[in-house]
Design a protein with these regions (language model features):
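Cofactor- and metal-binding active-site motifs of prokaryotic enzymes
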Residues: 1-175
Length: 175
């Protein structure tokens, strides 16, 4: 397996570059959600983020520390790999096949996981990341702070995993 990037995805790093792309300066954090069914080579240039968001289908950014997730800006990569920007409150307009995750405090997360084609992702109750969860195939797996670790096998397959960093309680991988 070739190591594509061992750099940790940090909310502040993604927010910094998203602010530049959207010409905004109030975003405090971001999350990466992973889907193994989309080739990362196609996704890399979409937002030109200088961080390893390889394999992402959804990237969210929230302004403010304690704002509800309904105020998030959502960037969704559809079948044509074109990014669409909207707000998470418009989630009802998103296809059931969209890879997505809600905050761990969202009461509808269990119902959503049942209807979504969900691979995996990270979610937290707020951008202070006081309570974080890892999702894998619709299941909630509690964890601490995690980083996204990407390995590439060949042109059509790759391994996406969550590599623990100091203070974590779990390690989850998806291949």
């Amino acid at each position: 397996m070739k190591l594509v990037s061992s750099t940790y995805v940090t909310p502040s790093l993604i927010a910094k570059h998203l602010n530049e792309q959207l010409e905004k300066h109030e975003f405090s954090g971001a999350m990466v959600f992973v889907s193994a069914d989309i080739e990362y080579e196609v996704l890399l240039p979409l937002l030109s983020l200088e961080c390893p968001y390889i394999g992402s289908t959804v990237l969210t950014a929230q302004h403010g520390v304690d704002n509800a997730f309904s105020t998030c800006v959502v960037v969704i990569f559809g079948k044509e790999h074109e990014p669409v920007v909207g707000e998470m409150r418009d989630i009802a307009k998103i296809s059931n096949g969209t890879t997505f995750a809600f905050s761990t405090s969202d009461p509808e997360i269990a119902d959503y996981c049942k209807i979504s084609a969900f691979s995996g992702g990270l979610a937290a109750d707020n951008w202070a990341f006081e309570r974080m969860a890892v999702f894998l195939n619709g299941n909630i797996i509690e964890s601490g702070t995690v980083g996204l670790h990407i390995k590439s096998g060949n042109e059509t397959t790759f391994d996406c995993g969550w590599e623990t960093i100091p203070g974590t309680r779990a390690r989850v991988t998806k291949s």
